[in-house]
From Swiss-Prot:
Protein name: Glutamate-1-semialdehyde 2,1-aminomutase 2
Designated gene of the protein: gsaB
Protein's pathway: Porphyrin-containing compound metabolism; protoporphyrin-IX biosynthesis; 5-aminolevulinate from L-glutamyl-tRNA(Glu): step 2/2
GO CC annotation: cytoplasm
Positions carrying N6-(pyridoxal phosphate)lysine: 267
Quaternary structure and partners: Homodimer.
Lineage: Bacteria, Bacillati, Bacillota, Bacilli, Bacillales
């Protein structure tokens, strides 16, 4: 069934580290094997190198909210290619796009474009340090903020301890600048601030978690984080690389009505091309060069191809009924999965917000990383492979979300639920 994918992976292993260009693309987290190599994509569908067709819920880990090869976005990219994809000068398009982002996310007085979500988060931390004159940051356990050294840190031995590196090559001295606490645990957050508050430059928050599944904040949690952080003289940074434009036209901060000082963006805002952006209050953003002492630059930053693709993507998302459709299909999918699980005696918990959901093989409600970690990875691995065999492409990790796109249809959801029911039957047997 996947003969050419296996052959291609074996060849890739000779030339590319691990045979993949991002570790999340390997099947290591689901028991190993050769990852399926895709050849083309259109709408909600993939076709692999062996000619098999899939309904796609990976959506490239989030960016492809309008479906693959959306004609309006494709046309914008063609226009960029015809007029030159990289200038190294200012363009009118980057001004247009900055205005669109500011209108959509009012907490951003000023914006700066970069090349990825990792870069956006990395720079917001630098800006926060420049503004506050402090060095330490707080992050929440299990929340991924890119692969820069400072955020590749896991929790220490307790909720108020300094971090330990989560990757080889990250010096302990850098990890010492990071305090990790459990998400949705305001008491642990208070304890961290009581111990380190005068040294904290910023707290880094996914307002809605997307990296150990879709996990919403408890009522009042974000408001308390804001209040406590500002009382300590530190800044609040929202990592909205996954969440911005995912649940509404704007940021999760606007959905939840809680405003940060700085915001990091990526994924969806590029329409499928590489991009990142960060923005925030004017007096904080004025720390950035050429106005201030916090240096950040990029050869590819604000390139016309990514900018025009991003503008086109937001134009599609502004259309009437887009987010209502995503919510409707998400509810339909969640309801069907839960129904089939009950019918076949499969223990699961589903976390869903509008058009994104995570299926945990667990009997407990997931509100933090420890609970997500306790979900049954072995059962998920089997489920993942059963779904792949039935033409459903999911992320190869128990921690990731299923992303619905504007290209998905009710028939796609019905076909997916047929596959889910069959997979659950096999799991039970």
């Amino acid at each position: 069934m996947h003969t050419k994918s296996i052959e291609l992976h074996n060849e890739a292993l000779q030339h590319i580290v691990g045979g993949v260009n991002s570790p999340s693309r390997s099947y290591k987290a689901v028991g190993g094997g050769s990852p399926v190599a895709m050849e083309k994509a259109s709408g909600a569908y993939f076709w692999d190198v062996d000619g098999n067709k899939y309904i796609d819920y990976l959506a490239a880990y989030g960016p492809i909210i309008t479906g693959h090869a959306h004609p309006h976005i494709t046309e914008a990219i063609k226009k960029a290619a015809e007029n030159g994809v990289l200038y190294g000068t200012p363009t009118k398009h980057e001004v247009t796009f900055a205005k669109m982002l500011k209108e959509a996310i009012p907490a951003m007085d000023k914006v700066r474009f970069v090349n990825s979500g990792t870069e956006a988060v990395m720079t917001t931390i630098r800006v926060a340090r420049a503004y506050t004159g402090r060095t330490k940051i707080i992050k929440f356990a299990g929340c991924y903020h890119g692969h820069s050294d400072l955020v590749l840190v896991a929790a220490g031995s307790g909720p108020s301890t300094l971090g330990t590196p989560d990757s080889a090559g990250v010096p302990k001295s850098i990890a010492n600048e990071v305090i990790t606490v459990p998400f949705n645990d305001i008491d642990s957050y208070k304890a961290a601030l009581e111990k380190w508050g005068s040294e904290i430059a910023a707290v880094l928050v996914e307002p809605i978690v997307g990296n150990f599944g879709i996990v919403e904040p408890k009522e009042g949690f974000l408001e308390q984080v804001n209040e406590l952080t500002h009382n300590a003289g530190a800044l609040v940074i929202y990592d909205e690389v996954i969440t911005a434009f995912r649940f509404m036209y704007g940021g999760a901060q606007d959905l939840l009505q809680v405003k940060p000082d700085l915001t990091a963006l990526g994924k969806i805002i590029g329409g499928g091309l590489p991009i990142g952006a960060y923005g925030g209050k004017q007096e904080i953003m004025e720390q950035v060069a050429p106005l201030g002492p916090a240096y950040q630059a990029g050869t590819m930053a604000g390139n016309p191809a990514s900018i025009l693709s991003g503008i086109a993507c937001l134009e599609v998302l502004k259309e009437k009924g887009v987010y209502e459709k995503l919510d409707h299909l998400g509810a339909m999918l969640e309801e069907g999965i839960l129904k089939h699980a009950e019918t076949h005696g499969i223990t699961i918990t589903v976390n869903r917000l509008k058009g994104a959901l995570t299926v945990y093989f667990s009997d407990e409600k997931v509100e933090n990383y420890e609970q997500a970690e306790r979900s049954d990875g072995e059962t998920f691995s089997t489920f993942f492979k059963l779904m792949l065999e039935r033409g459903i492409n999911l992320a190869p990790s128990k921690y990731e979300a299923w992303f619905i796109t504007t290209a998905h249809t009710e028939q796609d959801i019905k076909d997916t639920l047929t596959a889910v029911e069959d997979a659950f039957k096999h799991l039970k047997n």
